[in-house]
Amino acid sequence: VADMVAAEKIQLIVWGKDTIPNCKELFIPMQHEGGLVAGAFEEDGEMIGLVFGFPCSEQGVMHSQLVATLKEWRSQGIGTQLKWYQREWCLDHGYQKMRWTVDPLRAANAELNIRKLGGTCRTYYENYYGPMQGIDAGAPSDRLLLEWDMTSARVNGRAQGTPADVGFPQAGAANQVTDGVPTQSRLDLSDAQILIHIPDDFIGLAAGDAQLANRWRLHTRE
């Protein structure tokens, strides 16, 4: 139970005190009914990272609701390790696929979920959660649905250390940005690979300029 309370607290630290965290009264039955709540811990027992998922209605599919790492522990691969642990646990318990939603304007999401983990996205949801609080406030909550085929050659390769793609120099640019402001879109591209420019730090942008954050959201949604 103490770990579940710690899991509540880490959400408030990561997403902001104004958010409504998943509570221990949810975590505990989810854990008993086929879900997974797992943490990363410091040597003194402090929880520094968290991952949480639950079974989907579709057989053999897990939905991963969140992964979080305390700010002072980021850029050390902890979130990546939690996802690989989640994959191992899921495969051991009969799950072959995992899904979760990601903010398409957060560069760190693409780095972890697509490049490092080998996930793919085919579905775009507009304002998926409605208005949000904390670090997610300031713009509509558009999300990509990320699909993780945990037994695919792509994902197995990432798990075994195959280097992720490092760039697409021949890709066409779908939008233009001037001084941090999106200006033009090209919706007629037929290139096999297309690049979309996004902010380096959308969370910081939304905290400082909600109007510009909203402009970015509507621009990339288009």
Regions found by a protein language model. Name each.
Residues 118-119:
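Conserved Class I S-adenosyl-L-methionine
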Residues 86, 110:
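Aromatic/hydrophobic pocket-lining residues that form π-stacking "cages" and hydrophobic walls in ligand
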Residues 73, 77-85:
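Conserved acetyl-CoA pyrophosphate-binding loop and the N-cap/start of the following alpha-helix
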Residues 90-103:
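Conserved GNAT acetyl-CoA-binding A-motif
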Residues 93-95, 112, 122-222:
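Intrinsically disordered, low-complexity, positively biased terminal segments
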Residues 1-71, 103, 125:
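A conserved beta-strand-loop-helix scaffold within acyl/acetyltransferase catalytic domains
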